[in-house]
């Protein structure tokens, strides 16, 4: 078996122990100490409209050193094609994250931009990207940081049957076929395999609410998502 096949087969059916989760956990504990791989966020959207905009976009190859068939385009960022972390780019690597020239790009995605500005509970955006994985495409096992934190938003816009995001020792993230939002701890080793005949479209959001102050709306969404996991173990 290949590295990817071994990782998927060994971890896709794992479950994580939630038997000791406190029912009264607050936002700070959930995102920094719970050790959960993900928490669902229940945020409505016109998912077919977002999916249509994602499908029509022009994509740029992304991290081809550890993937195949993975591409991306920025909705908000330095430009449409600057899909990686700003420190990868020589001209920006010495800047602080606050000084990177992030802005809405000229991608033709009017509804997605409207939804992000009017409905998603962030006030400041860094990179916001459509991500595509072609049929048979994959992202090899990797981590995005060493410190635990639920800090990346991963949205399944179109997640065809047979496409999995698998987390080491914690199983498969339960994306709906279309339209589901998760706060994701990307410090855990994880991998993607699109074992389907359709393109897989996701959106990944990096940003924060209220200029580093966590809004009550966002706190409530995270706590509600966390509590939705509790019935699984009671």
Which sequence ranges carry the predicted segments?
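A short, structural micro-pattern
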Residues: 67, 124, 149, 197-199
């Amino acid at each position: 078996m290949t590295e990817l096949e071994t990782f998927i087969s060994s971890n896709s059916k794992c479950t994580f122990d939630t038997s000791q989760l406190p029912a009264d956990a607050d936002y700070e504990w959930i995102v920094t100490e719970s050790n959960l791989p993900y928490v669902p966020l229940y945020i409505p959207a016109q998912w077919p409209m977002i999916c249509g905009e994602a499908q029509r976009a022009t994509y740029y190859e992304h991290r081809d050193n550890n993937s195949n068939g993975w591409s991306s385009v920025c909705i908000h960022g330095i430009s449409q094609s600057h899909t990686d972390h700003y420190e990868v780019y020589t001209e920006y690597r010495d800047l602080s994250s606050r000084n990177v020239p992030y802005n809405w790009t000229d991608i033709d995605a009017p509804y997605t931009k409207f939804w992000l500005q009017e409905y998603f509970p962030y006030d400041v955006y860094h990179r916001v990207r459509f991500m595509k994985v072609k049929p048979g495409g994959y992202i090899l096992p990797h981590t995005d940081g060493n410190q635990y934190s639920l800090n990346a938003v991963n949205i399944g816009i179109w997640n065809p049957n047979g496409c999995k995001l698998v987390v080491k020792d914690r199983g498969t993230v339960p994306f709906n076929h279309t339209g589901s939002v998760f706060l994701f701890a990307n410090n855990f080793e994880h991998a993607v395999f699109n074992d389907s005949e359709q393109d897989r479209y996701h959106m990944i959001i990096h940003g924060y609410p209220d200029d580093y102050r966590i809004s009550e709306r966002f706190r409530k969404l995270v706590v509600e998502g966390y509590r939705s996991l509790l019935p699984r173990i009671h």
